[in-house]
Amino acid sequence: IMPYYGVPVGQTDEDVAMGYNKIILTDLLRDELGFTGVVCTDWGIVSSRAWGVEGLTIRERYKKSIDAGVDQYGGESDPEHIIDMVNSGELTMERIDQSVRRILLNKFELGLFEQSLVDEQAVSELVKTQDYIDAGFEAQRKSIVLLSNKGAEAPILPISTGSKIFVDGLDPEQVSGFGEVVNSPDEADFIIFYLPTIFNGNQVPGSEELIDKFLSGILPDENLAFDPSILERAQNYSQKAKLITVVDLNRPAILTELNDMSDGLIGTFGVYDSILFEMIFGHFDPQGKLPFEIPSSMAAVMAQQEDMPDDSEAPVFEFGHGLTYRQ
């Protein structure tokens, strides 16, 4: 088990991160729940993300986390502190052996000492089988969420085969089997506009400020709204043809403006372009549902309770939303 980075605020006798919290790792996880396996920390909890124990030295952080119940460290590479504590008597070999037994047991059960190398020739037979490939494609089909499907007389989706299509952000070769790909939005009957997941620093290539936010944050917590330049491009597209906007939703995004501009709005979670086009052209009926709500604004995001999954004010799309072509 890998404990969470965060602090269980107000739930134990001290507000320290899970990896330093004896009540969580020993009293709850091992004694109450009966866990006997390895506790491996998330990456860098000693050197860079020591939430709740920032005032401790590196050596003290190692000692506290081991006393809490940690067996193995992710992303740390300085065992000298632990060796020194054993030599000085601060840590007993009995405690070290306790973790060693847990770690070695996993390796024994996997047979790593008897057969440490895999049979490379068998990989394609065991892993990349047609059944697994088909199951993966089917999972992608089931994951696509049709968020909105507008139209004056009839819903815009699915698109009729043979329509003139302009694509932005997707592989035009993949759509060529469904419709006529055109080189300009002015020539198109439909524009399919794909937007990747918002990770702040990826919106304006070359922007040092945004890239710093992305890279230094690692787990981004900045604005969920799209850059104004993207909204302007979508607005321009909407004035030239019917606009189908596709947004990858590895994390929620503010879709208020895009929903207003788009004739059709689709949420994806990392699918092949070909699978997406199958859905857009009606080869299968979408059935995906949102695993979270889509908030209406950043103000609504900031006002909601961080420990509640779907309590923002007036969300654009609620948790569990998802249309089908039959609706």
Residue ranges and their predicted role:
Residues F113-Q121:
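Flexible hinge/switch segments at interdomain interfaces of large molecular machines
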Residues M93-L112:
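Mid-to-C-terminal alpha-helical segments outside catalytic/metal-binding sites
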Residues I1, D42, G69, I103, ...:
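Conserved, mostly hydrophobic/aromatic
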Residues A50-D67:
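Conserved phosphate-binding loops in nucleotide/dinucleotide-binding enzymes
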Residues T12-G19, G34, W43, S48-G55, ...:
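C-terminal non-catalytic regions of proteins with extracellular/luminal or membrane-system context
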Residues P3-N21, D27-E32:
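Hydrophobic, small-residue-rich alpha-helical packing segments that form membrane-like cores
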Residues I1-P3, G37-T41, Q72-G74, L243-T245:
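Hydrophobic faces of well-ordered beta-strands that scaffold small-molecule active sites
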Residues T26-G44:
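Catalytic PLP-binding core of fold-type I/II PLP enzymes
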